[in-house]
């Protein structure tokens, strides 16, 4: 079976017994991370999933609520650290709407060390998407749409 969904979290904003809603979509050897939850718990749930960080090349953030976006900073930090140590191949793309781009960029700029920030816009790309836009996430074809 080539396609799979790996649930990393199923909880809402104020969970204490599980992680916030986020998941990995697998197609062939590509993984797409959808949302990142509310903090550094994303690191342990990905570790528990057994998925190699090097196989996650794309992340999609649905909206900028804290329980969906704050884990993104930890994902960026982890992938940047792997890039810096030569353990991550290629680029990492994040897709989200304009408000998320601004939020992720601001949080990263205020919290991450320069050694992690240096990969943003060179190897880690935070891409704004518009309603109806299409992108490839490895072998997964995405069509973005606005529900508001």
Regions found by a protein language model. Give the residues of each.
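Metallo-beta-lactamase
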Residues: 90-148
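Short secondary-structure boundary/capping segments
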Residues: 15, 24, 50, 84-86, ...
């Amino acid at each position: 079976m080539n396609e799979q969904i790996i649930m990393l979290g199923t909880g809402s904003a104020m969970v204490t017994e599980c992680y916030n809603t986020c998941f990995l979509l697998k197609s062939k050897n590509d993984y797409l991370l959808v949302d990142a939850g509310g903090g550094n718990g994303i690191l342990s749930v990905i570790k528990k999933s057994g998925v190699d960080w090097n196989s996650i090349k794309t992340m999609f953030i649905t909206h900028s609520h804290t329980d969906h976006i704050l884990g993104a900073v930890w994902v960026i930090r982890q992938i940047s650290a792997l890039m810096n140590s030569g353990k991550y191949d290629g680029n990492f793309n994040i897709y989200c709407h304009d408000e998320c781009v601004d939020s992720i960029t601001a949080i990263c700029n205020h919290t991450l060390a320069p050694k992690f920030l240096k990969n943003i816009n060179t190897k880690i790309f935070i891409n704004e998407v518009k309603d109806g836009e299409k992108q490839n996430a490895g072998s997964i074809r995405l069509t973005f749409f606005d529900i508001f």
